[in-house]
Structure formats: structure tokens, C-alpha cells
């Protein structure tokens, strides 16, 4: 209720942890959790918006996904990245074409969030996009995220991964080894 009254409310990290603990406790004793999307849309503070986007993901508020998708146009890279991550985890497949469309004009961290979200969606419609994204990527971290997405995407994703591996040079071959090795994969 207090977020409805003060849209400019600032939260410190500790406040967010406390608020999350209160929400968890209320859930355990049988109270319904509120719908967080209204505070994403009304809060004036970036960190508060990000907190509520994370809560949407943690509480699997799939009904908030269509409204949350509007945050893909947020000026803040952090808000945009968290919205992308959350939409992927919520399996909001309708967002995939928009993610592909916006990919090339995003900073590297947002590109990685887009790739991870597409991997979470697993629509089998993005294999061509992932293949091209790998070919065009010049950042090794981004290439690594793309390879992991392909490797875990589907049987066709694995075939695409194998195809890229066959044409890899000695410099990029290490990325494929790191993606396939289960111990290294756990470090993500």
C-alpha cells in the first residue's frame, strides 16, 4: 500500500531484502502476493522498478508479461536488461520477434540478456538468428552466451552448434570446449 502513496520512494538494498522477506513470509502463511507490475509502471526510482521486475520473475507473475514487455523501450539499460531476463524466464514467447529486432542496437550486456531470454523461450524459431548473431559477434563473452544457448536450445540447436564448431578456427575452438565441458558450464 505504501508504494501506491509514494511513487518517489527510495529503497536501499537492505530495504529490498527486508521487503522480499516480508513478502515471502506472507506467502508462507497464506496471503496472496500483490501484483508487482503496477509499481514497475508507477515508481519513479530505477532501483525500485528493477526490484519489482525481479519480484515478478521470482513469483512467476506470467499475467504481468504483456505489460512488462513495454519496459523493452526503457531508456535505462538496467531496466531493459532485467525486463528481458524476466520475460524469458516467464516464457513470454510473444516477445521473441521484438527481442530479435532490437538485438543489433543494444549494448553487449543487453545482447547477452536477449540471447539468454531467447534460449529460455525455446521456440525453435530463432536458430537462424542465433547462428547469425554468433557469426556477427566480436565479443567473446557474447559468443560464449550464444554457444551455450544453442547447445541447450534443442536438437536443432545442438546441430547448429556442431556446424559452427566444425568451422571454428583454433582461437574460437576453446569457446566450444568450454561450452561442452560440464564442469566449466557450472561456473556461469
What are the language-model segments listed below?
Residues 3-57, 76-77, 85, 103, ...:
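Alpha-solenoid helical repeat scaffolds
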Residues 12-17, 45-47, 62, 77-78, ...:
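Alpha-helix N-cap/helix-start positions at coil->helix boundaries
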Residues 16-20, 34, 49-50, 54, ...:
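Alpha-solenoid HEAT/ARM repeat scaffold
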Residues 77, 81-85, 97, 101-108, ...:
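Alpha-helical adaptor scaffolds
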Residues 1-10, 29-41, 61-73, 92-104, ...:
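Amphipathic alpha-helical scaffolding segments comprising HEAT/armadillo-like alpha-solenoid repeats
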Residues 147-168, 174-181:
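Leucine-rich solenoid repeat scaffolds
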Residues 21-26, 55-58, 86-89, 117-120, ...:
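Core register positions within helices of long alpha-helical scaffolds
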Residues 104, 108-155:
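Ankyrin-repeat and related helical/solenoid repeat scaffolds used for protein-protein interactions
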